[in-house]
Regions:
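Gly/Pro/Ser/Thr-rich low-complexity, intrinsically disordered segments predominantly at protein N-termini
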Residues: 1-135
Length: 135
């Protein structure tokens, strides 16, 4: 998934960086509250320092595991929404679906089955079919 996002960013000459975990995202300037998303896309390079990103990434993807389920669906969802993340995908292998939050649109989340192609709301033309990645 990271490679698809990275290729799309590079192909479209976006001034963004794609970071896989472990990469710290801090939600306050004292750098005490942080998470490590599975994939982060940061387009504002002023948010980057030697420890990670201070402030909200533009786009975050989390892949749910049994141990991270509650954190990904509730805690991180609230943190990302409050911090200003523009788009958040929760990829859930157990349920074979992806929950997509387009926070800028202030709408209910969209649910996409792994067999469906997901279109990014903030990156026109970025499409990912999770089932294709799992083959």
């Amino acid at each position: 998934m990271r490679n698809i996002v990275k290729s799309y960013i590079e192909k479209n000459n976006w001034e963004c960086e794609v970071y896989p975990s472990p990469f710290a995202v801090f939600f306050n300037k004292d750098e005490k509250i942080y998470v490590e998303p599975d994939i982060s896309v940061i387009c504002d390079k002023d948010k980057l320092n030697d420890r990670g990103c201070v402030g909200a990434p533009d786009f975050v993807i989390e892949v749910v595991s049994k141990s991270s389920r509650k954190m990904d669906y509730t805690t991180k969802n609230a943190l990302y929404s409050d911090a200003g993340v523009r788009e958040y995908w929760i990829v859930d292998p157990e349920k074979e679906r992806t929950t997509i939050y387009y926070y800028e649109q202030d709408e209910a989340p969209m649910i996409s089955l792994f067999t469906q192609t997901i279109q990014s709301g903030i990156y026109e033309g970025l499409e990912i079919n999770i089932s294709e990645l799992l083959k």
